[in-house]
């Protein structure tokens, strides 16, 4: 799966059988395993605009409306030899997952990137653990801003080949004198915590104040990437609203509150971090 693809001509990685959980059972604990053939593709502006925009909106969560997501999708699609999509049933369908990187310095004057950089600097300044990120982004260095997102319930085993191919593609781009010689990689991600629903508290007034909720990762690989990071941590979304968890949850007993998350890794350590992700998720299977 980690085979490097030719840059001049798209060479799709062979389809991979991965088990996914089907949660449409009649009981909360009734899961069926479904075999799915995933296919890896380069970005294609002819077919990938809507799927790319949808996943980018999901990555930015409630703050997506702060940015021109159409312009961001176009920017991603403008460099089809960098990054990958994962699809089912052929290239013409929307992506189930994507991973790519944009050069913050090269694109800093373009509408989506300048707004995103300002946003990330402001968020980094709200958490002392993220302070190095604000410094790096404000320095004008060539930072590789990584966008990694996949549909909920997509298996984490898909992450290693996405990252491995990105490392290969960036290496080839640098050899071709393209502007991908980064000082750092900044991975934009998300975490979440389970919160006792405010509706439940109101309907069950005898309950005591909720205990501190645990923090969880949408992407398992983030925990591994932390070990190679200069800085990592959470930030609150600008438009967050805990009541949103009540409107989205249906039959769940717990609401879910998402947080933005950033991971900063020096470029020289990024290949080693990707290798660790491969080893960790391979061992977890």
Curated annotation (Swiss-Prot):
Biased composition annotated in UniProt, kind: Basic and acidic residues: 1-14
Pfam families tied to this protein: BCCIP (PF13862)
Region (Disordered): 1-25
GO CC term (a single one): cytoplasm
InterPro entries for this protein: BCP1_family (IPR025602)
Cell compartments where the protein resides: Cytoplasm; Nucleus
Ranges that cross the membrane: none
Sorted UniProt keywords: Cytoplasm, Nucleus, Protein transport, Transport
Broad class of where this protein is predominantly found: cytoplasm
Single Gene Ontology BP annotation: protein transport
Family to which this protein belongs: Belongs to the BCP1 family.
Record's function text: Involved in nuclear export, actin cytoskeleton organization and vesicular transport.
Protein name: Protein BCP1
């Amino acid at each position: 799966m980690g085979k490097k693809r030719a840059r001049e001509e798209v060479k799709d990685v062979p389809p991979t059988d991965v088990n996914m959980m089907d949660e449409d059972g009649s009981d909360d604990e009734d899961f069926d395993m479904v075999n799915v053939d995933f296919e890896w593709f380069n970005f294609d502006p002819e077919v990938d605009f809507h799927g790319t925009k949808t996943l980018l909106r999901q990555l930015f969560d409630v703050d997506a409306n702060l940015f021109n997501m159409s312009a961001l999708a176009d920017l991603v699609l403008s460099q089809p030899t960098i990054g990958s999509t994962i699809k089912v049933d052929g290239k013409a369908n929307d992506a189930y997952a994507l991973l790519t990187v944009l050069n913050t310095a090269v694109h800093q004057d373009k509408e989506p990137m300048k707004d995103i950089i300002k946003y990330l600097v402001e968020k980094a300044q709200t958490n002392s653990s993220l302070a190095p990120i604000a410094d790096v982004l404000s320095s004008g260095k060539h930072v590789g801003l990584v966008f990694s997102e996949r549909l909920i319930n997509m298996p984490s085993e898909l992450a290693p080949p996405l990252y491995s191919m990105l490392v290969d593609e960036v290496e080839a781009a640098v050899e071709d004198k393209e502007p991908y010689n980064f000082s750092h990689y900044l991975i934009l991600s998300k975490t979440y915590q389970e919160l006792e629903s405010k509706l439940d508290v109101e309907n069950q007034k005898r309950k005591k104040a909720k205990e501190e909720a645990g923090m969880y990762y949408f992407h398992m690989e983030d925990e591994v990437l932390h070990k190679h990071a200069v800085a990592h941590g959470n930030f609150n979304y600008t438009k967050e609203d805990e009541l949103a968890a009540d409107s989205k949850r249906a039959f769940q007993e717990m609401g879910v509150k998402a947080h933005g998350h950033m991971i900063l890794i020096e470029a020289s350590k990024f290949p080693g971090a990707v290798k660790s992700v491969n080893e960790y998720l391979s061992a977890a299977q």
